[in-house]
Regions:
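Membrane-interface "cap" regions at the ends of multi-pass membrane proteins
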Residues: 1-27, 43-48, 59-67, 74-76
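Hydrophobic transmembrane alpha-helices that form the core helical bundles
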Residues: 44-60, 72-124, 270-283
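Helix-loop-helix junctions that connect adjacent transmembrane segments
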Residues: 124-257
Length: 283
């Protein structure tokens, strides 16, 4: 269960969380928080429904295998398989195409951002840093197997949570809560939906989670609820702190305020958080 929670947290929380306030500043802390919670609830229901479909197909497959004298199969029932069983061949093609395109775009963004963080620290050019990041993590996943990837993901997730807690703690210390923009322009909240929706998505992991937990719906539900609740809490905390630091001005970077007060320690903290977030998302 811990592995599933770490997988969801690591995949959901990316370096983009630190820029969340740019889209929520106009709405204010409370309207933005309400929007975050509403979208999280919708996506949670969606994830639980996907899990039900996946496990139902898994059981159908196992029943068919038992009739032919074979046991349980550990092969993951993918989103494409789910689409094929529920929407037909056209649905499978559409889902496979969209997922492949999304994966390519997201991985490219992760590698590019990782190179941006690593290149100055290692005194390398961006292409070399990008290659090192890809080979190091990709090689570990490819040759180390599932257990090694799981151990690495859990380690990076703990580092992610620790660095994030330090960032929020620093922001809380330097923030002037009397100037907090609690209720800005509630009418602006709908404009934040696309960004928040994209930030909270983790549904491509559902087939892997169902297979990893052998179709145990109780554990699957627990893993999804706990794993998605942690990023929600992180987003709510950082959004409140960031909007308080920025005074509701989307052009003000709260990280710059923290960096000015903390100096070089802030740069190390931000780099550590960014690399941990990118590493877990990549895995």
């Amino acid at each position: 269960l811990t592995s599933v929670v770490a997988l969801i947290v690591g995949s959901t929380v990316g370096a983009g969380i630190l820029a969340l306030q740019a889209s929520t500043a106009e709405a204010g802390i409370l309207p933005a928080s309400g929007t975050l919670f509403a979208i999280w609830s919708l996506l949670l229901c969606d994830a639980l429904l996907l899990a039900e479909v996946n496990v139902a197909l898994m059981r159908e497959r196992d029943e068919d295998r038992l009739q032919h004298g074979r046991g349980h199969s550990s092969v993951v029932i993918s989103l494409a398989d789910m689409a094929s069983a529920t929407l037909g061949g056209e649905g499978k093609f559409a889902v496979s195409s969209l997922y492949s395109f999304m994966s390519l775009v997201v991985l490219t963004a992760y590698i590019s951002k990782a190179a941006e963080l690593l290149a100055p620290s290692l005194n390398l050019d961006a292409p070399t840093a990008a290659t090192m990041f890809t080979v190091a993590l990709g090689g570990t996943i490819c040759f180390g197997g599932a257990k090694t990837a799981d151990a690495l993901n859990q380690t990076l997730t703990y580092g992610l949570l620790l660095s994030f807690a330090l960032l929020v703690g620093s922001g809380t210390y330097y923030a002037d809560w009397s100037q907090a923009n609690w209720i800005g322009t509630p009418e602006a909240a709908p404009k934040t939906i696309p960004i928040i929706f994209l930030t909270l998505v983790y549904h491509d992991l559902i087939p892997v989670i169902c297979s990893f937990l052998d179709g145990d719906m109780k554990k699957i539900r627990q893993g999804i609820v706990i794993g998605s609740s942690i990023p929600l809490a992180m987003f709510l905390c950082w959004n409140a702190v960031a909007l308080c630091l920025a005074g509701g001005d989307p052009t003000v970077d709260p990280l710059a305020i923290i960096s000015d007060d903390m100096g070089g320690a802030a740069s190390l903290l931000l780099s550590g958080f960014g690399l941990a977030a990118l590493g877990t998302s990549f895995i």
